[in-house]
Amino acid sequence: MNYRFFVILFGLMGFFFGQLFAQETYRNYQEMTNALQELENEFPNTVSLQSIATSPNGHNVWHLTIGTGDIENTPAMAIVGGSDGAHILGIEMALKMAETLAEQASSETMSGQHVFHVFPNINPDASEQYFSQLRYERSVNGKNTDLDRDGMIGEDPYDDLNSDGLITMMRIEDPTGSWILHPDDNRLLIEANPLKSQRGAYLLMTEGQDNDGDGHFNEDPDGGVNLNKNFTYQHPSFEYGSGEFPVSETETRALADLLFDTFNIYAVLSFTPNNNLSDPWQYSRSDAAKRVITGILEGDEGVFQSVSDLYKEVVPQDNASGYSLQPGGFPEWAYFHYARYSFTTDGWWVPKVKTEGEENSNGPDSDKLNYLRWSEREGINTFTDWEQIDHPDFPDKVVEVGGVHPFAMTTPPYSMVDSLANVHIDFVTQLSAMRPELAFENIQIEDAGRNLTRITLDLHNKGSLPTSTELGTRTQWVRPINVEMTSDSSMQIVSGRPAFQIDRLMGGESQEMSWLISGSGSVSLSAGSSSAGFATYEHTIR
């Protein structure tokens, strides 16, 4: 009786302590590191963890490999978070994916079938600002950089003028300003349109002072380089935060080098403020025909559309965001320069709140207006009411500090993250099931007489995705399918090539091949590539 009592007691204690210590907030760098190390310890046969770089602030850029068997020659997907360090949700989503995929990979049914390369956060210097005493949206790493090119570094950072630990906005009453109060919600401001007889009444800028006296505010804060502007495709040279040159940063160079050396990756999924899964890339003849292409190739459009269709089936699309080109961005690099299928999503968007009789639901600053409606409905307080302050740079003007909190519009309450992660894990699971997969089908062995044997078969791509992008076949960076026939030394291949390459097989496509062989003994046939897997066949001719 006492034994049963203690069993029940300890069971209840375990339950309540588990509830007490359940994950309730976004994880910072150290908590993420601990979680990754725990995964490696829990699944030593399927998970390996390595640091590919050290950031300027001394943080490791972690790379988690999940899979078993021949890791280098099994089709793989890369999952990347944190290329924009202000996108906190994406980092947590990538980490949650790693945790679920590691558990799935340890099962016998998944053994040796697929590999995942997860980079949860490639810009930890920037994302740590979310967890700092002073919170503001930061996309740049910790590299000492003269962002305003005045010969000084970090001399004009943000200033917390109302001492609330947040950097929001300042509005300054000024007849030369170009901003007016929003007609539907005077907490927001919109740009005045002189053609509609609107006259500006406010200046609007981020919270802070002109610390260096150059007439600009907060133009040279701590850091750095925005890694999502630092990749090689359409690098925005000389733009704020883009870096001195493409892949100038330790983090971006390490990621690009590792991916270029990892030939078995067929697709890349990244979490960024962009979304080409709800708004898929479209083929444009003129863009694809340029010497330096600026649009996807025609042969790749169908894949982007079909994967988008899958995403829309799995992930609810209420008020889903869209895509706009980010020069120097990681998702763009992953297709145009790495030549893999590149999918990116922000993972969450504010649901549309319909307010009866509202004039400007799709008008200026409608996203912020919709966010305020939604946050009020959900009981989420992420707006600082405007409060008048004394500002040394505007001694004779009315200056107020307030606005939507940093990160609020892209970082949902943590209570929503599990459900968001679950639908995206479901999507990734279904996407990985579409991977290219090679097999030999319709094998025929015929006696051709005179000690000759004909072997005929089809090499079939059982997967839904092609064995490579069309762009990959053009750049010749994605490895083609290598076909090789070998036989005993006493045998001779009379017709049919002993070794050749196939550029690409579409999903469900087959290619017939045939050999005429003289003599008896063993023959072996292999066909495949690291990103599509390998098919093998052996036969003994008697």
Q: Model segments located where?
A:
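Edge beta-strands of extracellular beta-sandwich domains
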Residues: 533-542
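Metallocarboxypeptidase
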Residues: 48-49, 60, 80, 92, ...
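Boundary at the C-terminal end of the N-terminal hydrophobic targeting segment
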Residues: 20-22
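Short amphipathic, basic-aromatic surface patches that mediate peripheral association
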Residues: 459-473
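Active-site/substrate-binding loop(s) of hydrolase catalytic cores
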Residues: 73-76, 88-92, 96-292
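Short, aromatic- and glycine-rich surface loops/edge beta-strands on solvent-exposed regions
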Residues: 521-530
